[in-house]
Amino acid sequence: NLSRGERALDWKHCDNIPWDVLLLFGGGLSMAACIQATGAASLIAAQATAFVGLPPVLVVLGVATLVIFATEFTSNTALAATMLPLLAAAAPVLGIPTEQVLLVTTIGASAAFMMPVATPPNAIIFGTGRIQIGEMIKAGFWLNVISIIVISGVCMVLGDVLQLPMPK
């Protein structure tokens, strides 16, 4: 009750909040906003031209690799918020269905295992102090490689099964 001077949260309880995890995610979302506000997003999208003319499977593998490894340095939510509009716009130029690019990006953004900032579970595990970043990087690298292959394969099969239209 605020009228009696009671607070919703006292310092004793605030002290137990994992502030480091909250700051990591706040920083990631801020970075996504800065990337869009500064025009860096357009620069990133322009780099997609390197994939033009490649077979669709290589484009999907490239997008999965880009997204999964980029997610290691910012939160998956921030990365998805930044990359989905960029890759949706680039899909027709790349010669693959927009839905397929969005699927790879969305799933890939959640498949990052190397760094604490990548996903909330990574941050929680790192926050326990029982695992070091070096251990996360070693194990996470191979999980990322497996994820790239599996996600790309699934998205290619889904593209065929759902008969997604190729851009003209």
Model segments located where?
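Transmembrane helical cores of multi-pass ion-transport proteins
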Residues: 1-168
